[in-house]
Amino acid sequence: MVLALPSALYSYGQKKGNASLAFDEMLTAENLPRPPYKDYHEWYAAQDTAHLIRKTQDAENIFRKTGITFAVYGHADSSEKLIPFDIIPRIISAREWRKLAQGIEQRVLALNAFLDDIYHKQEIIKAGRIPRELIEKNVAFLPEMIGFKPPGGVYTHIVGTDIVRTGEDQFYVLEDNARTPSGVSYMLENRETMMQMFPELFTLNKVQRVEDYPRLLRQSLAAVAPPGCKGKPRVAVLTPGIYNSAYYEHSFLADQMGVELVEGSDLRVLDGKVQMRTTRGYEAIDVLYRRVDDDFLDPLTFRPDSALGIPGIMDVYRAGNVTIANAPGTGICDDKAIYSYMPEIVEFYTGRKALLENVPTWRCSEPASLKYVLENIADLVIKEVHGSGGYGMLVGPTATKKERSDFAEKLSARPSNYIAQPTLALSTVPIFVNKGIAPRHVDLRPYVLVSDKVKIIPGGLTRVAIKQGSLVVNSSQGGGTKDTWVLED
């Protein structure tokens, strides 16, 4: 039996703004549940709104007690904040997930091949598929990595691929996060919280597991230990320290993997190895999962004023005596100008068309593109090529006339610093509000582990624009998160 949700509980009928044009992942145009949501839809229809309000409050209390917070630097109030968590899951069918997983694996393998190529033979440049200056003048390109192959030949050990949806079978990659992708702790805590609060839902719905991620991460890191490693590889997580906005995640992952959480001051280079200070003296580290940016990794190689890294670690790395995950120099794959070439990159290294499409992108460094973007700035989303976290971007349709004018000046002054994309009607998923549920735009960050094999965690982190009409899902801009369910066949 298919139930339509009571109108008092379901506010989709009053869609406004961008949401009215978007593909809704839960309901059809006839207000009927799509297949992945059928069982959840029936369960929700029988729930009491007051009960769900209490559950939302319970979830907030769980997150607060657990200490799952983040800080937004540069704001007047940079205190630790909770990321809003929504109790309504995002549900993806097994068929939909298979399609996504195939495209993600193809893309991640292409990224790794691209990194190996640009730091060695540079065949893609010689073939004229990507401009030389885009690589060699890129601030994220590290000459120190030229000619060096990391242990196992893996550059991108952990990847977060941001995906958006615009229709039934229309998925796009929004960006690649190949340097230090974050957010996986929220994926894990979201699932644990949902299982604690709604155990009956996991009996009703056969949901694929994400809880194995810490174990799989440790296995994946151990698999790329240096060739000279004897016995069980020693893994550690390198954090910038307690004042970093993602420190909770660093601590959480180290604890869940059962490995040491270290800062640069805990490590030193001795006898050609990276050694960790312990109560028994110094002991060698084989694999370092670093959450410290390239610039701060080694003050002898990069920024001499860095107190976060380990002096001499790059010499140990290049000698093949430690694995750094992700490899230094992978940040070039996060560059949004490089992103615009991903269809060519995927085809060049895999011999096949990309299974997952890019969002159409104008490179503002090109005069014709710049002219188009300036003339159509009110309709476009404009981003800094090295930007992240929703900073430094303009969403034309929601910006004021003055904001667009000011941004056009910045764009004209440094066109190579920007790309532009159409304003997509991102798919919507319901969030719980005091009057029932309402549609909000979402994206998805699946997490990929790469060693001698590729492992994609089923689901990932769904980020949701909590504010009505907003397309910005970043937590630094007020976005929230959801548990993401991938159903079994």
Question: Model-found features: residue ranges?
Answer:
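Preference for protein termini
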Residues: 3-489
